[in-house]
Amino acid sequence: MEKADIGLIGLGVMGQNLALNLADKGWKVVVWNRTVPGKEENVVDNFIANRAKGKGIIGSNELTDFVEALKAPRVILLMVQAGPAVDELMDKLLPLLDKGDILIDGGNSYYEDTERRVKELYDKGMYFVGCGISGGEEGALHGASIMPGGAQEAWPVIQPMLKSIAAKAEDGTPCCEWVGPGGAGHYVKMVHNGIEYGDMQLIAETYFAMKHLLALKNEQMADIFEQWNKGRLHSYLIEITSAILRHKEQGGGYLLDNILDAAGQKGTGRWSVINSLQLNTPLDVIAEAVFARNLSAEKNLRVLMSQHYMHVENHPVYNYQDTVAGLESTLSVSYTHLTLPTT
């Protein structure tokens, strides 16, 4: 049997989509997923029989068979939850691997953990790559922004694979480049996510100002965001904000009006803020975005506290044009903030 170019472990939606993307680009892929009775059963078989049917992807239910199915040097992409799960999987994998083999961690791992893993594998003659992947489920399937870093020796081997599945810039350049040694790839992804935290909080506050200060309707706000997306604020987040504002449910009401105002988070924004404190670097916009998420998650407390304050719907008179222009300028703060000189 023809051996695979790359193995992928972890068949969540991101893992499945990356496997399909790799296969579509002509790479031979083998996949494996753990079995957890009652939670994760027959994951590989179901993937091969359904989404991967006819794609030439090899499914393996045994880790030893998975490793044996790979050509040398073996390249294995880990798409598992960040944290102890990565180390536990490495403990199972390393005895099965040889010198020169490559592990790529495609999750949102903490960059200091990646630094440790790079050194651990390097001492064994193997190569570890911490790889930030941005773009979500759609990006994984159709083209993501990919930020690899770690053992430089791995780059010539994995570069063709990663660049083939990356998104393409307007000039056709793949959105994938070697970032640097150690945990550099995951560090850049951490900062990227921190900027996104700031962006999303600014968008949320802009929505609040439009709704409660300018008393605009959803369609009016959608029009403004759509116009902004044609200019300097052109971005995925601004584009989908306009689309979300317009989206109606089957009953005719707006979807946004029925969404619980409690934001979740996975930790990368918090890591960015902690690192900024360690470096004595101001990062107040992103820090406040993290605090805002913490506060929003306390829904019951906010409801309780609101009962102690009188809410008065009294809209001051604002100049519409000046206010909208000011809000547009505010939305660039996350990027401007990171270009300020530091000591």
Task: Name each model-derived stretch.
Residues 336-342:
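Conserved small/polar residues in nucleotide/adenosyl-binding loops
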Residues 52-113, 122, 140-150:
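Rossmann-like NAD(P)-binding element
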Residues 6, 86-90, 110-223, 230-258, ...:
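Rossmann-fold dinucleotide-binding core
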Residues 1-61, 65-68, 100, 137-140:
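NAD(P)+-binding Rossmann beta1-loop-alpha1 motif at the extreme N-terminus of oxidoreductases
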Residues 261, 265-316, 320, 324-327:
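A conserved active-site cap/scaffold subdomain adjacent to cofactor or substrate pockets
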Residues 28, 127, 282:
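Residue-level detector of anion-binding/catalytic polar loops
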